[in-house]
């Protein structure tokens, strides 16, 4: 008889049977079917299509989420500032990607971006706050 192995979804925290969980890459860990469909698959698709991703920080009214930016090369400085709600700071991930965040996010006490913090490439010294844009270096003007 097989032992019942219960784990928690790495994205929403829901308890799931490990045998029915999904590989959540590019996020860390295993996820439930709902998060696989709503977050993991769209993220993989966007990264494979060279789209940029906007990881939205949680607010009073939402838990945060992920939006796809289909033509990141068309984004102006003003567009980037609008998406992160302030002045931008660029973080080089030392691979093909950069992050764009609100430079003053900590000063304004923006919430920790829990969705971004679950990405495999999120191993930075400090957790990021506010909205986070992940895009390829070549797409940045």
Where are these regions (language model features)?
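Short linker/helix segments within small regulatory modules
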Residues: 19-29
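Cys/His-enriched microdomains
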Residues: 7-8, 29-30
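Short, cysteine/histidine-rich loop/knuckle motifs that typically chelate Zn2+
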Residues: 10-13, 34
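Detector for the mature cores of small, proteolytically processed
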Residues: 49-141
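Short metal-binding segments enriched for Cys and/or His
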Residues: 36-48
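Surface loops and adjacent helix of pleckstrin homology
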Residues: 21, 44-45, 93
